[in-house]
Amino acid sequence: MSTVLPEDSVGLVTPQIARFDEPLALACGRSLAAYELIYETYGELNASASNAVLICHALSGHHHAAGYHAATDRKPGWWDSCIGPGKPIDTNRFFVVSLNNLGGCNGSTGPSSVNPATGKPYGADFPVLTVEDWVHSQARLADRLGIQTWAAIVGGSLGGMQALQWTITYPDRVRHCVDIASAPKLSAQNIAFNEVARQAILTDPEFHGGSFQDQGVTPKRGLMLARMVGHITYLSDDSMGEKFGRELKSDKLNYDFHSVEFQVESYLRYQGEEFSGRFDANTYLLMTKALDYYDPAAAHGGDLAATLAHVTADYCIMSFTTDWRFSPARSREIVDALMAARKNVCYLDIDSPYGHDAFLIPTPRYMQGFANYMNRIVI
């Protein structure tokens, strides 16, 4: 890319690392004696620390949400379309914090980190995590940054679950929750997709029970298959049909089982191979389990309205018409529960052909609705 950065970019950014030496008790019954969180910030924190916005990432996300690490970077952060001057999360107004969650593989302590007790990577011995664990670790980061109350917490997909959980766990520390393309818990179908993906990894001979780093190998085939399965669920049938149809890679069929014949096959293999070269298999297992386990209403007999009775935040819930992974009906479950609990909520169902991935794609109505809500937040 050009060395001249776009005017609406947050510009060049440098990741920072916060180290915590206080033990963090986890839902699984174990604890981490010490850990690190990598994060980035965009914009300036005001004198009263009232303009802070937390970005919570989805399954394969990370801390680099906006801007560039170098002027020669080919692409900006994963949500650059939404974060920056004049964008929905306007860095002329807000101080934005984006982190890589605990258990991740982009700089925060996770399975690929060295376990100080053994001198080897944690691997499969890294504790199983929950959305609630992430929220507690994020609260410690907020304390470290001098942020008592977030102006808003924003997330899509798994990130939306974290945003919702913040309002439940720390109701006095969140003024606005923007929950996009999410759900209050996974359906049986979603859990099933995650299990297929996990089995692809667990049965890869190179997985070695999660200790593949000790063996100097990577379960790339399992990760590739997991990503291919997941990626299908992120797209709509219409968008796949429009993009690929039944187009062939060449002008004829090969009548074998090994050739890549259809364009959609080539695309999925590319996505899987690219992902398997940058993501950690144990982190993938952790992230999908955190998704499966999330069910905040379980503590109230499945009554989500009762679960949300004590929250104080205002909510913006957004869904996308062709998202079948987290359908609009799942977002409306949250909206209905908030209304039953007599909370302030606005809901926008956006017509988009892009399926679950629509929360990453800056279509006009999405950007307008997102910006309209963020602009009304008083800082």
Curated annotation (Swiss-Prot):
Q: Where does substrate bind?
A: 227, 357
InterPro entries, per this entry? AB_hydrolase_1, AB_hydrolase_fold, HAT_MetX-like
Sequence ranges assigned to domain AB hydrolase-1 in this UniProt record = 51-360
Do the record's keywords include Amino-acid biosynthesis? Answer: yes
Kindly list the places in or outside the cell where this protein is found, as annotated in its UniProt entry: Cytoplasm
The cellular component terms of Gene Ontology attached to this UniProt record, alphabetical and capped at eight, are: cytoplasm
Q: Its Enzyme Commission number?
A: 2.3.1.46
List the pathway annotation. Answer: Amino-acid biosynthesis; L-methionine biosynthesis via de novo pathway; O-succinyl-L-homoserine from L-homoserine: step 1/1
The cross-references to Pfam families, in alphabetical order and at most eight, read: Abhydrolase_1
Superkingdom of origin organism: Bacteria
Complexes and interactors = Homodimer.
Spell out the HAMAP family in the cross-references: MetX_acyltransf (MF_00296)
Q: What is this protein called?
A: Homoserine O-succinyltransferase
Q: Which gene encodes it?
A: metXS
